[in-house]
From Swiss-Prot:
Encoding gene (name): rpmF
Entry protein name: Large ribosomal subunit protein bL32
GO biological process, any: translation
Keywords, comma-separated and alphabetical: Ribonucleoprotein, Ribosomal protein
Domain of life from the UniProt record: Bacteria
Family in the record: Belongs to the bacterial ribosomal protein bL32 family.
Transmembrane segment boundaries: none
Length: 60
């Protein structure tokens, strides 16, 4: 079993973990209904994508 020969310093440990953070998803605004939506996807509230209705949504 492999065992480290020297203690890993706090600096080296933190540099190794520097890229492990989570990034927030990018959000854009739907031009039709002005609700937030993910880019390159149809709007969840109105069902439009690039000015066309691609998903039928029922009004409640």
């Amino acid at each position: 079993m492999a065992v480290p020969k020297k203690k890993t310093s706090k600096s080296r440990k933190n540099m190794r973990r520097a890229h492990d953070f989570l990034t927030a998803p990018a959000a854009s605004v739907c031009p039709q209904c002005k609700s937030p939506k993910l880019p390159h996807r149809a709007c969840a509230s109105c069902g439009t994508y690039k000015g066309r209705e691609v998903v039928k949504t029922e009004e409640i």
